[in-house]
């Protein structure tokens, strides 16, 4: 499988390049990042534009760019019949609706979008979804490095959405006076509060807190190194050609 990486100069993108180059079933043929054009990523010279994918005859593009760039790159990939695996944060429901249109599953290119490629994080979201019907209150706290531009994270939003879909019985926030604006975080799906922390020294962490009378449950996942995302990325790259249309999340790949 011939693979190109978009956002190849970033922390995640450079790690993905190394993972693609190291896998015996994959071939890194293109690396794209306008901010690092001319540099080297896992033995490949970084190009400045997405057209490098066509020149290298890439079959799959892995997207780890800012959301603004990802939108245009995904349109290009759909038009040029390149499968896409997307780890970009900041894509909303409107973006997913457009991706369903761009990748309709009619024999053309396919697309997998995952809010998180760490297997532990996927399990955390699944466990939170399973626990949701048994609790009346819940909050999500996500913590990331201080270079992350978007807040809250896509993982936090997806977690709240899955919990809200699993249970509609969430108690209303009792806070009537917020002394410091934003102290109670933002409201995710179902009114579930989502809090974002940006701190130097972190990679990524998320904790889901659920409570009911007399008990609480905490579900937490910590990322200590970006290599933990690579098995999920590799899994998605190898699977995307056989997953018609748009697939959201790794659950379908892991659990069927």
Predicted regions and their residues:
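Hydrophobic beta-strand scaffold residues
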Residues: 28, 46, 84-85, 110-113
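Rossmann-like NAD(P)H-binding beta-loop-alpha module
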Residues: 123-135, 151
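Rossmann-fold NAD(P) dinucleotide-binding segment
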Residues: 53-56, 60, 64, 68-87, ...
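Rossmann-fold NAD(P)-binding glycine/threonine-rich loop
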Residues: 75, 79-80, 88-111, 126-129
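Structural motif
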Residues: 6, 64-65, 87-88, 114-115, ...
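Extreme N-terminal starter segment of soluble prokaryotic enzymes
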Residues: 1-3
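C-terminal substrate-binding/catalytic lobe of Rossmann-fold NAD(P)-dependent oxidoreductases
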Residues: 6, 11-55, 136-256
């Amino acid at each position: 499988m011939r693979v190109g990486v978009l956002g190849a100069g970033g922390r995640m993108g450079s790690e993905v390049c190394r993972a693609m180059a190291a896998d015996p079933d994959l071939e890194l043929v293109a690396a794209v990042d306008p901010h690092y054009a001319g540099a080297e990523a896992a033995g490949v010279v970084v190009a400045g534009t997405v057209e490098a994918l066509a020149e290298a005859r890439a079959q799959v593009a892995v997207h780890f760019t800012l959301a603004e760039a990802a939108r245009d790159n995904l349109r290009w990939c759909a038009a040029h019949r390149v499968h896409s695996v997307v780890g970009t944060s900041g894509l909303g429901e409107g973006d997913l609706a457009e991706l369903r249109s761009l990748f309709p599953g009619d024999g053309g290119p396919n697309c997998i979008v995952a809010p998180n490629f760490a297997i532990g994080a996927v399990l955390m979201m699944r466990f939170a979804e399973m626990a949701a019907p048994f609790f009346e209150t819940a909050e999500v706290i996500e913590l990331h490095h201080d270079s992350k531009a978007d807040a809250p994270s896509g993982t936090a939003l997806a977690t709240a959405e899955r919990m809200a879909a699993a249970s509609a019985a969430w108690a209303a926030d009792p806070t009537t006076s917020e002394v410091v604006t934003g102290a109670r975080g933002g409201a995710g799906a179902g009114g579930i509060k989502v809090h974002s922390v940006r701190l130097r020294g972190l990679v990524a962490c998320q904790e889901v807190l659920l409570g009911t009378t007399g008990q609480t449950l905490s579900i937490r996942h910590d990322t200590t190194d970006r290599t933990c995302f690579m098995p999920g990325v590799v899994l998605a790259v190898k699977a995307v050609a056989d997953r018609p249309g748009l697939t959201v999340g790794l659950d379908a790949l892991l659990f069927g």
